[in-house]
Amino acid sequence: MNISATVTVRDLATGIPGATRVFENFGIDYCCGGHRTLADACQEAGLPVEDLTRSLEEAGSAPQPGSGRDWRQESLTALTEYIIDTYHFFTRQELDRLENLFDRVCSRHSENHPELFEAQKTFYQLKQDLIPHMLKEEQVLFPYITRMEEAAVEVRAIPTPFFNTVRNPVRMMMTEHDTAGDLLRQLRGVTKGYTTPPDGCVSYQTLCQALAAFEADLHHHIHLENNILFPRAVEMEETSAPDFYKSAGEFNEHRCFGR
């Protein structure tokens, strides 16, 4: 893939194996902010575009761990199942673990580090948002995407859902992704980049490490939905029901790929 300053972060994240790890290392938002060009993202982060380009080239030529599945080519049903089994499972598991860690660390260190209460409050808001968010995806949006794909494969009409068009829940999910991204940035700021203070105990260190890992996982989770699943679902529905889309108006592709 051609790597240049004018290519969007989204296209680099989906087209280059290992690109998401590079973006994580440089602090580049590739999930909710994937619509920006590489040049714009570097300017916002205060980074030389040459450094990021070089790292992306190295990542693209390096052997990649894992399954190596190209989710741009796999079925949408397989992708939704992967998201649920891998990311939703991990998110629920870690939210409970992080809540317990916050309780423990706040009880021991809040006197010297009152900012912990702000971090805990932000985390609770994130948890309260993510739990129903994942349920809506699992119970409403993802099943419809599966039914839509089955109808497309069998060349039959797509059943009209109660939400009229897949674009409506997609917009809602992406708005909620934006909120989650904002809360993660607040958490990172309050904790000074998930840094353990000199007087922090092992539990404090574990909390900071777990928050950093949770952030990276949620970034990739949202990337798969915002930049691959949702655009493909919208495109499939549009291709299967072009007359409906003509009357409904254009879908804002840039909004689908991030703010």
Task: Report each predicted region and the residues it spans.
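Small-residue-biased structural context
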Residues: 1-259
